[in-house]
């Protein structure tokens, strides 16, 4: 197979299907030569903020001189984004080489009358092969869904476990209470291995800390109040982490969203906890958080154009907190879309309750999960936004939103990572011409 055929093969594997047992994933790793044992792993779970926290960790480790692999999901434009080595996407040849190894194993399993790896499991196995072959020092490993039964939990000896913000999402798989969802996420905790977690939700924090105590794992809570924000502008945020280890250090992050302060503190606390295993100077830590780049989370993609992949109510509330900060200074335009298994009515209500937009355009994304643009527009109108316009084609909707934004306004594109991916693709195609 060539690269395009390999990608097509993976994409044809059902994404939402019955998971194989974790023992099956472990057996796959064993038959691949246990690649996950050839590097140190930081395992990251959570509802929101996983990818950003992973990016902060990776950037700090890189600035400290370590080689680092990063496995995340989903991808926005190309599937290679899921595998980064030293903060760069892998090339097509590297992708194909790992694909061939995992495909050979999958064929053997099927021939034996066993199981075929799921979509995510296939990619996870590829990631472990890619990073082992590259000889990286560390891998920052993001879970796909949940934690307890996630394929990534087949890695048995992480150096640290990190659990980011927990809220309602994927309830059909993880449960419909914070306690149940937190229990799934806490499934990544390993006996004796330190866990660093977002303690802002008391219910989730209780579940995580109790699980850590049961397993004899040291646990460290980080909360929003641990930060003192000193500056918040269109170029980023300066803050101090009220923490004895970092003292009076002032950190700068290149993001405008306050929630990224929390994600960066989780990474900073993780580095502190691992201080006996790694050598990282204060300068490297400061450079690491300052130079972190992450797609799709309050990301400025063009002047005055910000995309955010918030796709659940908690994520949208955090988006609103940031976007509302700018409505006194700029006329705001909104481009919105969502898929049918999200609480899109609550998301829309949350946005409109706090922000006044000069223009609102809705479009449709997500393949078989898409919601008709007209349906979303009607909900905006029901929620008090009678001027909402529907435009089915994302590229055309983006062009229209850019025109309505004008030279002096700001355009926020939010509601789905599918939307973010299609906008970034449109920009690459030269939509602005």
Set out the residue ranges of the language-model regions:
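Short functional linear segments
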Residues: 1-46, 53-66, 71, 107-114
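ATP-dependent carboxylate-amine ligase catalytic core
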Residues: 29, 34-37, 63-156, 172
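Beta-strand->loop->alpha-helix junctions that form or flank phosphate-binding loops
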Residues: 71, 198-199, 213-233, 253-258, ...
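Extended acidic/charged loop-beta regions that coordinate divalent cations
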Residues: 74, 123-173, 205-250
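Nucleotide phosphate-binding/pyrophosphate-handling subdomain across enzymes
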Residues: 133, 138-143, 149-162, 166-170, ...
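Membrane-proximal helix-turn-helix segments that form the acceptor-binding/catalytic region
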Residues: 182-191
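C-terminal helical cap/extension that packs against the catalytic core
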Residues: 201-211, 216, 304-306, 348-410
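Active-site-proximal loop/hinge segments that shape catalytic or ion-binding/gating pockets
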Residues: 416
């Amino acid at each position: 197979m060539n690269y395009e055929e390999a990608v097509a093969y993976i994409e044809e594997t059902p994404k939402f299907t019955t998971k194989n047992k974790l023992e099956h994933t472990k057996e796959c790793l064993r038959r691949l030569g246990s690649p996950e044992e050839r590097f140190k792993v930081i395992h990251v779970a959570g509802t929101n903020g996983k990818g950003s926290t992973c990016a902060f960790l990776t950037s700090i480790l890189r600035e400290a001189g370590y080689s680092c692999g990063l496995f995340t999901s989903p991808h926005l434009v190309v599937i290679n984004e899921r595998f980064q080595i030293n903060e760069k996407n892998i090339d097509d040849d590297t992708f194909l080489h790992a694909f061939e190894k995992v495909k050979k194993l999958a064929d053997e399993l099927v021939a034996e009358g066993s199981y075929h790896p799921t979509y995510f499991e296939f990619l996870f196995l590829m990631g472990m092969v890619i990073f082992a072959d590259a000889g990286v020092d560390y891998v920052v490993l993001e879970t796909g869904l949940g934690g307890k039964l996630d394929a990534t939990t087949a890695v048995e000896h992480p150096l640290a476990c990190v659990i980011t913000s927990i809220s309602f999402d994927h309830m059909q798989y993880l449960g419909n209470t914070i306690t149940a969802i937190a229990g799934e996420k806490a499934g990544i905790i390993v006996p004796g291995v330190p866990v660093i977690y977002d303690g802002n939700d008391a219910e989730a924090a209780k579940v995580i800390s109790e699980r850590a105590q049961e397993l004899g794992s040291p646990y460290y809570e980080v909360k929003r109040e641990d930060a003192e924000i000193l500056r918040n502008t269109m170029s980023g945020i300066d803050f101090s982490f009220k923490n004895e280890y970092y003292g009076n250090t002032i950190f700068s992050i290149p993001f405008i969203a306050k929630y990224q302060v929390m994600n960066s503190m989780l990474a900073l606390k993780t580095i502190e906890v691992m201080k006996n295993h790694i050598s990282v100077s204060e300068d490297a830590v400061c450079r690491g958080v300052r130079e972190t780049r992450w797609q799709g989370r309050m990301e400025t993609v063009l002047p005055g154009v910000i995309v955010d992949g918030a796709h659940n109510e908690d994520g949208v509330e955090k988006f609103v907190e940031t976007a509302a900060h700018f409505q006194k200074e700029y006329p705001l335009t909104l481009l919105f879309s969502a898929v049918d298994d999200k609480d899109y009515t609550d998301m829309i209500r949350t946005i409109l309750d706090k922000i006044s937009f000069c223009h609102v355009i809705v479009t449709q994304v997500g393949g078989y999960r898409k919601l008709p643009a007209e349906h979303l527009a009607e909900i905006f109108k029901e929620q008090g936004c009678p001027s909402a316009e529907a435009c089915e084609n994302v590229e055309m909707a983006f062009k229209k939103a850019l025109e309505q934004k004008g030279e002096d306004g700001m355009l926020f594109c939010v509601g789905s990572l599918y939307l973010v991916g299609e906008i970034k693709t449109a920009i690459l195609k030269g939509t602005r011409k």
